[in-house]
Regions:
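Short, highly charged, low-complexity non-transmembrane loops/tails of multi-pass membrane proteins
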Residues: 225-234
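Single conserved hydrophobic/aromatic residue that forms the stacking wall/gate
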Residues: 2-13
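Loop-centered beta-sheet repeat module
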Residues: 43-96
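Hydrophobic alpha-helical transmembrane segments
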Residues: 54-68, 132-135, 199-212
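Membrane-helix interface motif
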Residues: 30-45, 109-118, 175-185
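Short, membrane-exposed interhelical loops at transmembrane-helix boundaries
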Residues: 182-201
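Transmembrane helix-loop-helix
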Residues: 1, 95-98, 102-164
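Mid-bilayer segments of alpha-helical transmembrane spans in multi-pass integral membrane proteins
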Residues: 1, 18-35
Length: 234
């Protein structure tokens, strides 16, 4: 097989990998939007239509999550790369940060306007005082992120701050719908599996989770540090 054929197959694989990653992330974001909107449930069974998920809000949430994960990827490359690639990723990350803040602001305003229960959760007293740190931290982390991306000596903080922004975003989701797991009517406890099933799963989790953690820490240790030019899989 000649090198041109190998390069062609490599390009096809890259496009498929990119497309599949974007589609999976977009679908996950649409799922988040559908959870915020709530589901039609009658007698503990879904009673909505087959295309209830296809709304402008859900599509918007899907696009927002694509931007969030793209920022995770670009700041990861800031941390792992150097020279020209790192500088390019810093510029890309600044653009993605602005886009992410636009999506966060739009969804944060859109959600309470469309869902009175969520508006009451966030904007009534004394809840407002207790929940105000969430948007305040988003602003603080974003300002720190911008400064770090402009600082050529900052390598790890942009990625860590992006993790913080995404954590705050999902924390806001949890605050908005708690204690419901299937809004607007089924709570976490109502949707829970029987106690015996949970106990069985707990035993398996206690055995598997330590193995996963050890493997994850070891893989990060092996691939620690910067990736030099020419290194990687071919």
């Amino acid at each position: 097989r000649d090198s041109s054929t190998s390069r062609g197959l490599g390009d096809v694989y890259k496009r498929q990998f990119i497309g599949g990653s974007i589609l999976a992330t977009f679908t996950q974001g649409m799922t988040v939007g559908a959870v915020i909107n709530g589901f039609s449930v009658t007698g503990r069974a879904y009673s909505g239509g087959p295309f209830d998920w296809l709304t402008v809000f859900n599509l918007f949430c899907g696009a927002g999550l694509v931007v969030a994960y793209a920022l995770l990827g670009s700041t990861w490359l800031v941390m792992k790369s150097e020279n020209a690639l790192q500088q390019r990723m810093r510029r890309v990350s600044r653009t993605l940060l602005i886009l992410l803040l636009v999506f966060i602001a739009a969804i944060s305003l859109w959600t309470p306007l469309a869902q009175p229960a969520i508006a009451a959760r966030w904007f009534t007293l004394p809840n407002l005082f207790f929940l105000l740190p969430v948007p305040a931290l988003v602003v603080i982390l974003s300002l720190c992120q911008w400064r770090c991306l402009k600082n050529p000596e900052s390598h790890h903080l942009p990625f860590i701050l992006t993790l913080g922004l995404i954590f705050l975003g999902f924390s806001g989701l949890g605050i908005s719908i708690w204690p419901h797991i299937i809004p607007p009517s089924i709570t976490l406890w109502q949707a829970a599996a029987p106690t015996q099933s949970q106990g069985f799963m707990l035993v398996g989790a206690l055995l598997i989770i330590p193995v996963i953690l050890v493997y994850t820490f070891w893989s990060y240790y092996v691939f620690r540090g910067k990736v030099q030019h020419g290194e990687g899989y071919h």
